[in-house]
Amino acid sequence: MTIERRELIGGAVALAAVGLPSPAIAKETAMHGLIGKMIAAPDKRDELAAILLDGLQDMPGCLSYVVALDPKDPNALWITEAWTDAAAHAASLNLPSVRAAITKGRPLIAGFGDSFTTVPIGGHGLVPTR
């Protein structure tokens, strides 16, 4: 399938009209994002998810932290995070509540799948901080 120049320009104009942010905004916001797949030990996914979801309100700089079930893998979880910056994420790993969750959850983790670092630029419910 090829896209004609007119369609491309029309699409760009439509996106601009609805106010979607430009990729250039990424440099200004410097938000830090992570998306990762975590594999729980057999029949431990729900228990691991509960640990990951506990105490989320006490993470300074965390704009979004979503734990999702993988509908195709009964042992997999997807974690999607958005942070004010990479430093806030790094600092969170030293919080007592996060250290406790890591200690409690580690025996329930069988492994890890794909993981990606992203630069969030906005979205529903995600407000750039700068």
Q: Positions of the model-derived regions?
A:
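An amphipathic, aromatic/His-enriched active-site/gating alpha helix that lines ligand/cofactor pockets
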Residues: 9, 54-64, 82-117
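Acidic/histidine-enriched, glycine/proline-rich intrinsically disordered or flexible terminal extensions
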Residues: 119-130
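C-terminal segment of N-terminal export signals and the immediately downstream linker at the start
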Residues: 20-35
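Short, surface-exposed ligand-recognition loops at beta-strand->loop->(often short) alpha-helix junctions
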Residues: 37-47
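N-terminal secretory signal peptides and thylakoid transit peptides that target proteins
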Residues: 1-15
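Short, well-ordered beta-strand segments in beta-rich or mixed alpha/beta enzyme
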Residues: 32-38, 66-94
